[in-house]
Amino acid sequence: MSTTWFVGADWLAEHIDDPEIQIIDARMASPGQEDRNVAQEYLNGHIPGAVFFDIEALSDHTSPLPHMLPRPETFAVAMRELGVNQDKHLIVYDEGNLFSAPRAWWMLRTFGVEKVSILGGGLAGWQRDDLLLEEGAVELPEGEFNAAFNPEAVVKVTDVLLASHENTAQIIDARPAARFNAEVDEPRPGLRRGHIPGALNVPWTELVREGELKTTDELDAIFFGRGVSYDKPIIVSCGSGVTAAVVLLALATLDVPNVKLYDGAWSEWGARADLPVEPVK
């Protein structure tokens, strides 16, 4: 495992009563799991003291696109209501697949939180170590949170179109190869098959082992093998902006600079007939 942005279950168990630590449960249903009630799953059992960071609820509901970043003031109010304090060390976890914790990690950092770590192995790893869970909601006093949005963290569709057309940045697509190569339909209806012209495919699952990032040597080999250069700006994308954060986390672990996330992702690009797509049918 690469450890730059991670803490282990043993460390968290030792520090769980530290008043400067706050734990955030960011489990999330993936496309095709719409029948899951992750809020109820959280209530049924979570790491002691963890509040539920509902990525769906914390998205911009004025946008037709899924999981878009909310307005900074909206996010700040939600964090204060959860009892989250931006000056504390926030520990984020998901169910143990590293699917959604990186998105929560990225959101918190994009809105100005400096100390954010991910629990390696997530909830599954915590349970494998026979550590205790608690049930029910966690009620905390109102938190202190004033969002300081970093506009450099995210790009819009016009930025991606320019990067694709002018080759000013590399575009990395985190979706599975079959979706990237237009071999299967997207899980969300109404989207075209294929990928942004010029994009490189680095499926997020190839970067992960048992809910943790692979070693830095392994990550380097994967990125280099897919043609990624660390010397050029990078835009990460995926289906809806969630698993792109896994790629961004891996690149951050490798100290790669100038990496931004395309929040609209394929949910936006694939829905627009006026944007180019590869492979051309």
UniProtKB/Swiss-Prot annotation:
Record-annotated Rhodanese domain positions: 17-135, 165-278
GO molecular function list: 3-mercaptopyruvate sulfurtransferase activity; thiosulfate-cyanide sulfurtransferase activity
SUPFAM superfamilies documented for this protein: Rhodanese/Cell cycle control phosphatase (SSF52821)
Function in brief: Catalyzes the transfer of sulfur from 3-mercaptopyruvate to a thiol-containing acceptor to form an intramolecular disulfide releasing hydrogen sulfide and pyruvate. May be involved in the enhancement of bacterial growth inhibition by serine.
Gene name as annotated: sseA
Subunit structure as annotated in this protein's UniProt entry: Monomer.
The protein's name in its UniProt record: 3-mercaptopyruvate sulfurtransferase
PROSITE patterns, alphabetized: RHODANESE_1, RHODANESE_2, RHODANESE_3
Species the sequence originates in: Escherichia coli (strain K12)
Any matching Pfam family: Rhodanese
UniProt keyword Cytoplasm present: yes
Swiss-Prot/TrEMBL GO biological process terms: DNA protection; response to antibiotic; response to oxidative stress
GO CC field: cytosol
EC number: 2.8.1.2
Domain note: The N-terminal region is the non-catalytic domain; the C-terminus contains the active-site cysteine residue and the CGSGVTA motif probably responsible for substrate specificity. Contains two rhodanese domains with different primary structures but with near identical secondary structure conformations suggesting a common evolutionary origin. Only the C-terminal rhodanese domain contains the catalytic cysteine residue.
Taxonomy, superkingdom: Bacteria
Keywords per UniProt: Cytoplasm, Repeat, Transferase
Binding site for substrate: R179
Localization (cell): Cytoplasm
Active site: residue positions: C238 (cysteine persulfide intermediate)
Catalytic reaction list: 2-oxo-3-sulfanylpropanoate + [thioredoxin]-dithiol = [thioredoxin]-disulfide + hydrogen sulfide + pyruvate + H(+)
UniProt region (Substrate specificity), positions on chain: 238-244
Principal subcellular localization: cytoplasm
